[in-house]
Each structure stands twice: as C-alpha cells, then as structure tokens.
C-alpha cells in the first residue's frame, strides 16, 4: 500500500542519501509536518485511551474498537516516525537494515490495523442500529474483546508476508523504509485490493445501510409518533463516519498510485511526479493524528473528558480515576432509541 523504494540489503552498506536536487526547504517542511504529527498523535491518542478508561459513559463495546484504533495510530508515532525524522535530518538512512525492516513492518501494522479497526467500527455501528435486538448478544464485553483480538491477528497475518517477500525497502524520496510497490505487481495489487478496497467497500455498505434505515424510519412513523433524533446522537454517529472519510481521503492517493505502478512498473514509475508521491505519503502519515482531534471536535463526552484530564494534569491531580462519578454525570446515561414497528433502531455514542 506504499511506495516504490530503494533496497537496503544490509547494515554495512553506505548510507542512502536523498536527492540532492531537491529544494532546501522541502526537508524542513517534511520535518515540520512529521514533528506536528508525532506530537499530536501521541498526546491525542493517549487522551482517547485515558478518556475511555476514566469515563463509564465511554466504556462500551463500540469504544473498544476506538481504543484499538488509537493504539494502531500510536504505533507509528512511537517508533517509525521518529526514525523517519532522523533520516530527514541526516539526509539519508544510517540506522541499518534491522531498524529499516522493523520500521517498515510497524508502519504496515499500523495502517492495516487502522483500516481493519475502522471496518470493525462500521460493522459495530451497523449491528447496533440495523440489528439492535441482537446487538447485546453479538457485542458482549467478551465477544468485543475477541473481535479486537481477531482484528490484530488478521493484521499480523496481512503484514508478515512483507518480511519474506523483500518488499520493505528504503525510499530516499520520502526518507522512509516502506512497502516497495515495484517489487511485485501481483503482490502490490493484492495488497491494495484486500487491505484497502475491500475494507472500504464493507465500510461504505455499512454506513449506507444505516443512513437508509434511519431515513426509512423517519418517513414511515406518523408525525405525532415521529422519533426525535437528538443533535448529540446525530453527532455521535457522524463522528466515526468522519473518521472513515478522512482515512479514505488521506490514504486513497497512495493506494491509487500503487495500482498505477503495479499495472506497468517500467513505464509508470517515471511518469508519477515526485511531489505527488511525497505528498501522498505524508498526507497518509498525517492521518494518524486526526482521529483524536475529530473525537474532541464532534463528541461531547470525549471533549469533556479531554478537558478533565488536562485540568487534572495542570493541577497535579491523579487522573487515573473514574471521572464518571462527577456530579454532572451521575444521571444514568442511555442512547436514545428510534422505534419502528418491529425493531428498535438506536444511534450509538462513541
């Protein structure tokens, strides 16, 4: 799902340098983007995990996948991105073969883990709204943990072939050890199809079914019995949809470039502008810091918990405590249902 790279066979080889013809400001710009991404990624996703841990209103089956997605985003900020940053500062990779392979492997683990978790979230929302009578049984705490474990096992199975296929290589254009699209056309096409296009189709199907059902319910119910969809409920549903849309926008260019390269590597690689290739990569990198921002902007429960955690840190209070016992939160919280003649249609909260 990533770029056309240059081989780095072993740690004893000379350092691979970037293209000397590049403008001097480019490396600085890429470094600034990456530093911002790393800082926001780490702080934001730690806030997400702590928010779910502290607040009972956020501790539900759907948010198990949200925490799992936050972990996937954290993976790249903790190890691969700092190594890419060092490569930018050194104008080449001088960390050796092992770090290159581990960095590329963890990047793949993060992106595929992210898309599989986003798919899991979409399926969870679909079951919650379209099959609500079966939801509690399908998504018990035990089952939800099993689903998350399955997601990571599938992610691991999807990434491991990269180590044996020799597709993890250093690319000086992006200062990263990454998936080389030109090594095997068939393998690259398979990666894009099964690790991006198929999950995207599943997610689109789930969200389309949700919107269709909600619209049908609103049209069928008599005016005096028409269910009220609270603004907060609508925002909670839209939050995860926005997460999906931004992920698709950030990663689609890189995947379509991969398909183009795989179709005819010899002729397509020289025809892809370097600026487009680099921009598509760093746009994909940038996506890892967006989710926590989305939750804070669109979800009131997360926004309040972010504020509590920050205040706790600033006042040196212990923040590993259950904040849902606050006076304002003692009223029992329930998602408001949408009733139909033969089923219950609910709008879940993140």
From Swiss-Prot:
Melatonin binds at residues 162, 181. GO terms for biological process: adenylate cyclase-inhibiting G protein-coupled receptor signaling pathway; circadian rhythm; G protein-coupled receptor signaling pathway; G protein-coupled receptor signaling pathway, coupled to cyclic nucleotide second messenger; mating behavior. One of its GO terms (molecular function) is G protein-coupled receptor activity. GO terms for cellular component: plasma membrane; receptor complex. PROSITE patterns: G_PROTEIN_RECEP_F1_1, G_PROTEIN_RECEP_F1_2. Keywords: Cell membrane, Disulfide bond, G-protein coupled receptor, Glycoprotein, Membrane, Receptor, Transducer, Transmembrane, Transmembrane helix. Disulfide bonds join 100-177. Expressed in hypophyseal pars tuberalis and hypothalamic suprachiasmatic nuclei (SCN). Hippocampus. This is Melatonin receptor type 1A. It comes from Homo sapiens. The lineage of its organism: Eukaryota, Metazoa, Chordata, Craniata, Vertebrata.
